[in-house]
From Swiss-Prot:
InterPro entries: Beta-prop_NOL10_N (IPR056551), NOL10/Enp2 (IPR040382), NOL10_2nd (IPR056550), NUC153 (IPR012580), WD40/YVTN_repeat-like_dom_sf (IPR015943), WD40_repeat_dom_sf (IPR036322). The keyword DNA damage does not apply. Keywords: Nucleus, Repeat, Ribosome biogenesis, rRNA processing, WD repeat. Residues 518-668 are annotated as: Disordered. Its main location: nucleus. Residues 557-602, 610-620 have a biased composition (Basic and acidic residues). Component of the 90S pre-ribosomes. The keyword Disulfide bond does not apply. GO terms for biological process: maturation of SSU-rRNA from tricistronic rRNA transcript (SSU-rRNA, 5.8S rRNA, LSU-rRNA). This is Ribosome biogenesis protein ENP2. Residues 542-556 have a biased composition (Acidic residues). PANTHER family: NUCLEOLAR PROTEIN 10. It comes from Chaetomium thermophilum (strain DSM 1495 / CBS 144.50 / IMI 039719) (Thermochaetoides thermophila).
């Protein structure tokens, strides 16, 4: 169930084909599986089981009690009977020929008469075909006189007695015989034509009976006239002529005082039986023959008129003539009927499935599907957003420039909306290609340009260069990139308040200052590399002198080393020692003081006991995984007396155990 026509008078499609062509079973099953979890299809359900035919449906009617729906269709020719109380198919029955139209003679489906395309009338009961009778010429419509129990069959061609009139066959169902036909003027036929007449033979196209009122019969002809017969006098009482085209549809109002007729040119007229001039004239807009006319009444006692051709269903206000609402199915329509005392409309159409429309403003849902009212209220409360993904909005001047203005009101490819129309995207592309043959080359060049621009935008772009504080810009950009926030550095560059920070050298950050180095101790300054090395070396030398005052035994330091777990030594290739960079740059005449480990020269063992020697050898033979400080080389470079003020060394709390040793090499 979906909203077909949004607006002041909404129309809901309860059942009907989703495509204009019948799909094969395997493709239909695949679409059902793929649309199972589609949010738009959550309200879809099957109202009546097997409410369809193999190819198309011809006619559909509802019984007077509202419990049965009978429909005819093809192929193979057959008719279906649905039970509305069970919402399912009761039975189906095949016939010998295709059905033209049918009538329900009883309040339920038990008695029905069917007009077939092979000039036969079939009477069906629940047990089967009760009787079949053949009529002299092809019939166009059926009507039933309940007072006299007669079936009226308007036919094609002229009578056989040479009077030059068309005939309406009368079959008395009580006596089971044909009565004298009523003669209707349908014009002249070509001389020498057969019994059925020529191709252009006149015909009585349609019949209507004013039931429950005066019972006057009206017959529409192919020459644009309407003749009225009184069944009591069995004679013609009036003629209504001068209509454009053939009369294809007739319908009496409930009070029997007005008559609506439709022509083959799509014109609709409403007449008062007391006045030959029409009360209302309307145009269906499609230029197609009118198939059905139905008088309707809303719950507020407003009188409406339904008109239908094979393309669209329109409902008019009978008093003002304004369009109330409309429905445009995807397939061609063959017949339209209204479920009495409700807002539901059923159609027989060329599609496989028959349509079922529900108009809440026209009336409540039938009692056999009363749940539709609650479903409609739920759908109205939901927020709907209608999208036109496959449509292009064009104004009327734009339609004229594309030579599409002749399609206005003639196809569903143009949907009126506000001051323009929604045009189907495929039609729009074809029209543009016809009006401008070079549009494809222009579109191709445009897409290539967009692709190149997209590739350029995806490249990694460097940070904008500035005159001053370039490192500050890079640092801020890197920090913002890690946090995943917008680029604040770019905003700072564009902000005039911070303009001088990146342009004026007076705002340059001095990275060699003491404050900067205290706040950024890990920042490497290329220009002050040599000074930093010298500071470190002199600091190490002074610390060695201060620590040389104390003395301690090496044995006291061994327990701390033994607590560390030994690791497997990694064999490293021997490298040739290269002089340091600052050593290579020194002149040869400068004084250089070097300190080397005392273990390289060997110690005196003369006054040492043998046990202590063995113990020392054992300790020396242990594998030490830590850094061997005794093998380091320190180089001291004398400096001038004028020294730069050194920043105070950062004091960190001691976490290791206090040692009495003053060995400077141990602290390296």
């Amino acid at each position: 169930m979906k909203l077909t026509n949004p607006g002041p008078v909404p129309v809901y499609t309860v059942a009907g084909p989703s495509t204009a062509r019948p799909l094969p079973d395997w493709l239909l099953r695949r679409r059902k599986r793929s649309a199972k979890y589609d949010p738009e299809n959550l309200n879809n359900f099957e109202l009546i089981q097997e409410f369809e035919f193999e190819e198309a449906s011809n006619c559909v009617r509802v019984s007077e009690d509202g419990n049965w729906i009978m429909s005819t269709g093809t192929y193979k020719p057959q008719f279906h009977v649905h039970n509305t109380r069970e919402l399912s198919l009761s039975f189906s029955r095949h016939t010998n020929s295709e059905n033209v139209t049918f009538l329900l003679l009883s309040q339920d489906y038990s008695k029905s008469v069917h007009l077939q395309c092979d000039r036969t009338l079939e009477f069906h009961t629940p047990m089967g075909c009760h009787y079949s009778i053949r009529i002299p010429r092809f019939g166009r419509d059926l009507a039933y006189l309940r007072q006299s129990c007669e079936v009226l069959v308007p036919a094609v061609g002229l009578s056989s007695d040479g009077s030059g009139y068309g005939e309406v066959f009368r079959l008395d169902l009580e006596r089971g015989q044909f009565l004298r036909p009523w003669q209707v003027d349908v014009g002249e036929d070509e001389p020498g034509s057969g019994l059925q007449g020529s191709i252009h033979a006149g015909a009585v196209n349609v019949a209507a009976v004013a039931e429950n009122t005066h019972g006057l019969c009206a017959f529409g002809t192919s020459i644009g006239t309407v003749e009225f017969y009184d069944p009591r006098s069995k004679s013609r009482v009036a003629v209504l002529g001068n209509q454009d085209g053939e009369i294809t549809a007739l319908d009496y109002s409930r009070d029997g005082l007005s008559l609506a007729l439709g022509t083959s040119t799509g014109q609709i007229r409403i007449f008062d039986l007391r006045n030959p001039r029409p009360l209302l004239k309307k145009d269906q807009g499609m230029g197609l023959p009118i198939k059905n006319l139905i008088h309707l009444t809303t719950p507020t006692e407003e009188r409406k008129l339904l008109s239908a051709d094979k393309r669209i269903i329109k409902i008019w206000d009978e008093q003002s003539g304004d369009l109330w609402t409309s429905v445009e199915p995807l397939v061609d329509l063959n017949f339209v009927t209204h479920v009495p005392d409700s807002g539901m409309i059923l159609t027989a159409n060329e599609g496989k499935q028959m349509h079922c429309f529900f108009i809440p403003n026209l009336g409540l849902a039938p009692r056999w599907c009363h749940f539709l009212d609650n479903l409609v209220h739920e759908m109205e409360s939901e927020k709907r957003t209608e999208t036109y993904d496959n449509y292009k909005f064009l104004t009327k001047p734009e339609l004229k420039s594309l030579s599409l203005d002749h399609l206005i009101g003639k196809t569903n490819l143009l949907r009126p909306y506000m001051h323009g129309f929604f045009v189907h995207a495929k039609l729009y592309d074809q029209a543009r290609l016809i009006t401008n043959p070079y549009i494809w080359e222009e579109e191709r060049a445009k897409r290539i340009k967009e692709k190149i621009e997209k590739e350029r935008s995806s490249r990694i772009r460097g940070i904008k260069k500035v005159k001053v504080n370039q490192k500050l810009v890079e640092k801020i950009a890197e920090r913002q990139e890690k946090k995943g926030k917008p680029d604040v550095a770019a905003a700072m560059l564009q902000d005039p308040r911070f303009g001088k920070l990146f342009e004026d050298e007076e705002f340059a950050v001095d990275e060699t200052s003491r404050e900067f180095r205290a706040l950024n101790p890990s920042t490497k300054i290329p220009g002050a590399q040599g000074d930093q090395d010298g500071d470190v070396k002199m600091g190490d030398f002074s610390s060695e002198e201060e620590s040389s005052e104390g003395s301690g035994s090496e044995d006291e330091r061994e327990p701390r080393r033994e607590n560390k777990k030994p690791e497997k030594p990694k064999e490293k290739p021997k490298k040739v020692e290269e002089p340091k960079k600052h050593e290579a740059s020194k002149p040869k005449d400068e004084v250089v003081m070097q300190i080397r480990s005392s273990k390289e020269q060997g110690g005196k063992l003369g006054d040492t006991a043998f046990g202590e020697r063995e113990q020392k050898d054992t300790r020396a033979s242990r594998i030490r995984t830590g850094e061997v400080v005794g093998e380091q080389v320190l180089t001291f470079i004398p400096e001038s007396k004028k020294k730069k003020p050194q920043p105070a060394p950062e004091t960190k709390p001691r976490t290791d155990r206090r040692s009495a040793s003053n060995n400077a090499l141990r602290k390296l």
